[in-house]
Each structure stands twice: as C-alpha cells, then as structure tokens.
Regions:
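A short Gly-Trp-Pro
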Residues: 1-11, 16-156
Length: 156
C-alpha cells in the first residue's frame, strides 16, 4: 500500500456522478458482511474512510439506496446504480475505492464481519474482526494506520 495521490478523482461506471478526495484516508477496510456482499455482488466490499471535509461530489446527484436507515446511508449513481460511498458518522465518508480512477494504492488495513467471510477469501488486512471493531479501538486503529501508511511498516 502507498499513499493516495491527492487530489484523487473518480466516478461511477457511467460517469454521471463524479467524486474527488483531497485528504488521506484515516482507515482502509474490507467488509465481509452479507449486506456488502449483496450490494457489491462480490465476496466483500473495499472502502477507505475519508475525512468528510476531504470528500466532495463534483458532478451529479447520488441517490440513497440499499437499506434505508437514517444512521447508515449508502449512495449510488441514479443512472448506473454503482454503489459509490456510505455515510454513517459525520466525521468521515466510506468511499468505495474502486470508484476512484486509480485504486492501485489501496490495501485493506482491517477486515470486518469475518463471521460472514466466504471460506476461500483471504485479504492482506493486518487486523480482523468477526464483527466490527469496538468504538473505543478506532482511535488506536487510526493512529496505527497513519503510522503504517507513513511507511514505517516497510522499514521494519
């Protein structure tokens, strides 16, 4: 994994909705929950938690889809229905990294909901959780991720 080159832009599959990231992620993850499996039509979803002030929709009007819940809002392109990002805490936005023009920098630092993980799946995530990390662990995880992202993990 390397640092994300900023600003980073991306779009849905049809290009109707365009996004931009102007801040480094605070955490990267793979989620194995059944909801992510179904919404992504894959074994897991990949996302980067971006500080809210470092994320913007440049063009288009994403629509809320997936499960309707005031605390968990999944945004899709209304035209091609690509799942683009999720908002559930005011401090950050979970961006589906494959919506970015270049996702080659990405690797998941944590994996969540491994209790629903398909038996053949493996990821390079450093931390695994059968559910989600307890809220009190996020400060430690984001600090460790920042240190890891700075390249300290490569120097041994």
């Amino acid at each position: 994994m390397s640092k994300l080159v900023l600003p980073a832009q991306g779009s849905c599959r049809c290009g109707e909705v365009q996004i931009q990231i102007s801040a480094q992620p605070i955490l990267t993850m793979a989620c194995h929950c059944r909801g992510c499996q179904r919404m992504s039509a894959s074994a897991f979803s990949l996302s980067a938690a971006i500080p809210t002030n470092g994320f913007e929709v440049l063009r288009g009007e994403p629509a809320i889809g997936g499960l309707r819940n005031p605390d968990l809002r999944h945004f899709f392109c209304p035209q091609c229905m690509s799942w683009m990002f999720t908002r559930f805490l005011p401090e950050f936005v979970n961006v589906r990294v494959t919506m970015l023009n270049d996702a080659s920098w990405f690797a998941p630092f944590i994996e969540t909901r491994t209790s629903a993980k398909l038996p053949w799946v493996s990821t390079p995530a450093i931390h695994s959780y059968s559910g989600f990390p307890p809220m009190e662990e996020y400060t430690k995880l984001t600090a460790e991720f920042s240190h890891w992202l700075s390249g300290a993990h490569q120097r041994g």
